[in-house]
Swiss-Prot record:
It comes from Mycoplasma pneumoniae (strain ATCC 29342 / M129 / Subtype 1). GO terms for molecular function: 2',3'-cyclic-nucleotide 3'-phosphodiesterase activity; metal ion binding. It is an enzyme of class 3 (hydrolase). Fe cation 1 binds at residues 12, 43-44, 185. It holds the Pfam family YmdB. This is Putative phosphatase/phosphodiesterase MPN_349.
Length: 281
């Protein structure tokens, strides 16, 4: 008899829209897919940057089991020491020792579920613009894999470019259970089970504002940035909402992914879709 574990992985939670669409839909999704575990990237949960203690607890109450992060992990300074040390939260692993917060939290964790040792790892790509140094994610993950201390290994690769994520997949196909790209907030159309049995997608997408936003932010600010080089704090758009994620099932005996499916829910507000931004150019 096959022993399998079913997972839901949700992309970057961005602001109030992302929090609420998860709260309103996660229980139904867990029931639909009979999911055993839910993993969420929460690096943009609090006003678009970082994760506060209040919103960490919000996600847990909504039914999230484990949380991954990204380049905005350290933005919510007030709650940082508490949140980053939560046993079910994984911040980026490949931090250089010169980074002030490199010794806070964990970049990878191992837990047991259904007689399987499961590892979750969070890594930053070399293509993400950062104000601090990181170590090479390829070399860091290889070193971790060589420990051979888990049955399943779920990797959240928080990176900017499609080429780096594709290269990551080619390098680690069959050596980890999943390689899920995060960070760009736009879901890619390449979800697949690789020839060696890993699940891969270049970017899962986000749980946040809908199509009336620019990857979650107000369009006006993004247009001014690209047209005039305007540098301002991006505000989270109030237009509708979208939820993007991946369902996947793993055969514990073979350690291979046997099923994947993209998850997408869109709840757009037509008022924002009809806005005219032409005169901003």
């Amino acid at each position: 008899m096959m022993n399998s574990i079913k997972f839901i992985f949700l992309g970057d939670v961005y602001g109030k829209a992302g929090r609420n669409i998860i709260k309103n839909n996660l229980a139904q999704l867990k029931s639909k897919y009979q999911a055993d575990l839910v993993i969420v990237n929460a690096e943009n949960t609090t006003h678009g940057k970082g994760l506060s203690l209040k919103h960490y607890e919000f996600l847990k109450e909504a039914g999230v089991n484990y949380i991954t992060m990204g380049n905005h992990t350290w933005f919510q300074k007030l709650d940082l020491a508490v949140v980053i040390n939560k046993k079910d939260l994984v911040r980026p692993l490949n931090l250089d020792t010169s980074f002030a917060f490199h010794n806070l939290g964990q970049g990878s964790l191992v837990f047991e579920f259904n007689k399987a040792k499961i590892r979750i790892t969070n890594l930053l790509g070399t293509s993400v613009p950062l104000p601090f140094k990181t170590t090479n994610p390829f070399k860091v993950l290889k070193e971790l894999i060589l420990k051979r201390d888990c049955d399943l290994h779920i990797v959240d690769f928080h990176a900017e470019t499609t080429s780096e994520k594709n290269a990551f997949c080619m390098a680690f196909d069959g050596y980890v259970t999943t390689i899920f790209g995060t960070h760009t907030h736009v879901p890619s159309a390449d979800l697949r089970i690789t020839p060696k049995g890993s699940a891969y997608i270049t970017d899962v997408g986000m749980c946040g504002p809908g199509f009336g936003s620019v990857i979650g932010a107000n369009p006006e600010q993004s247009i001014r940035l690209f047209c005039a080089g305007s540098r301002e704090h991006f505000e989270v758009s109030k237009c509708g909402a979208q939820l993007n994620g991946v369902f996947f099932e793993v055969d514990v005996n073979t350690k291979k992914v046997i099923k994947t499916e993209a998850i997408r829910i869109v709840e757009d507000d037509p008022r924002y879709l009809k806005q005219d931004y032409f005169n901003l150019i």
